[in-house]
Amino acid sequence: MATLQSGSQGTDVKVLQQDLQLLGYTITVDGDYGNGTQTVVEQFQKDNSLIVDGIDGPETQAALNNLVAGIVQGIDISHLNGPVNYNTLSSDGISYVFCKASQGTGFTDPQFQTNYKALTDLDIMMAPYHFFEFENAPAQAQADNFFKCNVDFTKQGILPPVVDIEWQSSDALNQYIIDNQVACVRLISDWLTIVATQTGKTPIIYTNANFWHDYLGNPSGFGQYPLWIAAYQKNPPPIPPGWADYTFWQFSGSGGISSVSGQVDRDRFNGSLDDLKKLAGVGV
């Protein structure tokens, strides 16, 4: 790659910005090597004991490539992200995609079937996720809504089902969780049991350590489910009690890649690509 510096523009600059973002640096992915990018490059150089000149030359590129080489990258999307250029995901370094499938007892994502078909046709690993609701939303009814999306979990390349457990759309709904904590924890447990039984897969739990503590009280009994933790920070994320480590880490809610217009959530897998393929049943 050519040396990049202030004033450079184009695809190579986007790749640089994406890689820095992957390492937890706050940077806009726009293909423009402006003051913001130069400042982040300088910080990266400082953090890695390189000459601090704000120029992405051979030594900086080598250090950056060495750090990102082993990271298995993914994104998570819904209809809110709009059209996705699926054919360029691989060139963006994306190995897997989480796709919103359903929410509560009645909503199914209008983009899900398009995402599902396109990704499986291209042999890109994917996982469907269900956004969990708590009030007037029985576990069986939520599971049935998720099943209506007709995901074939026996197909190679399909990761386990995911339940998204986080803040709700209003203060009143969030307060409901606090006021009915025991019942809400049971609701989650029931959904996981139903989905595991129906699919034959151990579901993945997506959550945030603060939400898990503040709203659910750090409940026990969930450590057997792989953890997808949301933590927008540079350092490794905090892990809720009951888990030894994370399986996936959503490290940015305002990421950027060429395949998606606008911002997109970015993720990294805590393991090798072979480990991820095993989780997705590839080669089994």
Question: Locations of the language-model features?
Answer:
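Glycine-rich, charge-decorated loop segments at or immediately adjacent to ligand/cofactor-binding or catalytic sites
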Residues: 138-141, 213-221
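Functionally critical loop-and-helix segments that line ligand-binding/catalytic clefts
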Residues: 69-78, 88, 220-284
